[in-house]
C-alpha cells in the first residue's frame, strides 16, 4: 500500500507543479469500516472506471436485488482478470465480490442484532471492531493476490494455521524487511496516528496577500 499510494502521490504532486490536477487515488483505505467503504478509498481511479463502464451499464443497483449481486460479482471478477490472467487473481476478485454480497445480505440482521444488544451505531467500540474486521478480511484476500499459483496459495493458507514461530527475532526481521528498525516502525505508526487525528488531508496551502503559490494540494 505504501509503495502504491506513495508513487501515485508523487505523480499527483508532480502534475500539480505543472498546473495539472489529478484525481485522488487513495484515501486512507485501511481505516475503512466495511469492504464497500474500502473500495471507495482504494485505487479510486480504477474503481471509478469499473463503476462507470461495467457496473452502471449492467444496471448498477437500480435493478432486482439478485441482479445487483450478479453485477457486483461480475465487476470484481473482471477486476481480478484486469490484474492478471491467473486463477489467483480471479479468486481474489471473487472473494471481494462475495464480501460485498454477504455484507448486503447481512445488513438487516446486523442492525437487528445491534438493536437487541442496545449498541449504538456511533459507538467508538463498534467503529474499532468494524475497522479491525475489515482490515482482517482485506489482508486475508491479499493472500490470494500474492500467491504465484494455486499450489502456492494452498501452502500460504496452511501456514496460517500451522508452524507458528513468533519470536522477537521474527518480529524484528519483519520490520527490517521493510527497511525499518523497531524504533523507526513505532515512530512511523505514531506519525500516521497524529496525521489522522489532524485530518491532514483537509489541510490546504493557499495563496494570500503574500503572493505565495500553492505547490501541493491534497
Task: List each model region and its residues.
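Membrane-embedded transmembrane alpha-helical bundles that form the catalytic cores
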Residues: 1-191, 196-218
